[in-house]
Amino acid sequence: TALSIGASGLPVQVHGIGSATRDRAGMTPELYLRWLTAGVFSSNFAFQGVDGLMPWDFGEETLAHAKTWMQWRYRLVPYVLGAIEDSARTGLPVQRSMAMSFPNDPHAHDWDLQYLLGPALLVAPVTEPGKQVRVYLPKGEAWWDLNTGHRYEGGTTWTIDCELGQFPVFGREGHMLCLGPAAQHTGEFNSARILDEVWMFGMPVHNPVVMRNKIRVMQMQGSSYIKGLEGLRISPSEGLEVKRRGAEVRISRAR
């Protein structure tokens, strides 16, 4: 698996959506879409490029969801490439097992399908049919549901609603997620403006992981002062307010 390979020293892997060499009779639209969304929140993936394993082969609803998730993948490119740069510096894989990421939380080690994508996102792949999934969020930290914006305390197993248009991904409190603009292909990327928006999971504490990172976070008197967010949309967590002053952004508790 990607997590085992990553733990063996190979930081980035690629996997194909579906299995081109096996009987596709069991490939339902739900299974295909869950597989695709798992690929979107992985280090790298590819379509098989064969009849019967492309998004339009599974109906209009699946195709519509697939388009949405592919837009998400393009928006994640700055973060994923930043995680790859981080791997080159630290040796940590882009997809990090729970045991590797949370060595002091023995319960986390039992959840061997969940993983961190980079340092900021916890991904819980949906591996069974249905619209709910059980997720363990590691103790000692808080986690923000990317689908709903709800904040969860760690150290507990939660049952999360997960419709076909949703996927269980959680932002790690204290981190930021830097997103690029939506695109149809990488040729539309503007190398001079790779970022479009920043999502904050609680009060920012850590410098974000993002390609060519020039964003810096400094804490002072209960607030975070951030440089490098000029021209970007900022989506703070509930209870925080944003104030811009020249090239600096101040994040503080709402009064």
Map each language-model feature to its residues.
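Surface-exposed interaction regions enriched in Ser/Thr/Asp/Glu
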Residues: 247-255
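Phosphate/diphosphate-binding loops
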Residues: 1
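Catalytic core of carbohydrate-active enzymes
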Residues: 5-15, 20-238, 245-246
